[in-house]
Amino acid sequence: MSGKELNKIVAAILFASLIAMMVGFIANILYKPVLEPKHRGYSIAVQEVSEAPTTQAQAPINIPELMKTANADNGREIAKKCLMCHSLDKDGPNKIGPHLWDVAGRPKASITDYKYSPALSALGGNWDDDSLFAFLHKPSSYAPGTKMSFAGISKPQDIADVILFLKTYVHDK
């Protein structure tokens, strides 16, 4: 290969590169891309829900009356969702939550081999009907900062049924 032929090949490569660059510059001039969007993503209209009390005052819940009409069999059905995280066996293992054997009347945060959240450990007192009712209704309101991620049981009669069911798992049995 002679020097002339080599020069022609190099010139052809340089000319092709120059043409490619010119096409790129012209394309950028003709088609200006939008680099920064005005808003990122999509806006979704969401209705705000406030936790403020409604204008209608709710009647206080009479827990002793609910306990009189409580049904342990119904409580057993409702409590099945508890068994994913809790055990009902006497001296049963702790799962995600502590075992619930003899929970009614027991001091709060009293299972020694379970690590309770500081929120629940600080409460003190025993698990009576009122405290169990409040905790089962909405654990995060009763003990803000609790590890229990359960949303709660909304129907008061269902809560009373679960409490009566839990009372069947006591030290006398």
Swiss-Prot record:
PTM remark: Binds 1 heme c group covalently per subunit.
Cell compartment(s), UniProt: Cell membrane
Predominant subcellular localization, coarse grouping: membrane
PROSITE patterns listed in its UniProt record: CYTC (PS51007)
Family matches, as Pfam families: Cytochrom_C
Transmembrane segments: 9-29
GO MF, one annotated term: metal ion binding
Residue intervals annotated with topology Cytoplasmic: 1-8
Residue numbers binding heme c: 82, 85-86, 148
Keywords: Cell membrane, Electron transport, Heme, Iron, Membrane, Metal-binding, Signal-anchor, Transmembrane, Transmembrane helix, Transport
InterPro entries associated with the record: Cyt_c-like_dom (IPR009056), Cyt_c-like_dom_sf (IPR036909), Cyt_c_1A/1B (IPR002327)
Gene Ontology CC terms: plasma membrane
Topology, Periplasmic side: 30-173
Keyword Transmembrane helix in annotation: yes
Membrane topology listed for this record: Single-pass type II membrane protein
Domain of life from the UniProt record: Bacteria
Keyword hit for Cell membrane: yes
Primary role: May be involved in electron transfer from bc1 complex to aa3.
Similarity remark: Belongs to the cytochrome c family.
Protein name in UniProt: Cytochrome c homolog
Biological source species: Rickettsia bellii (strain RML369-C)
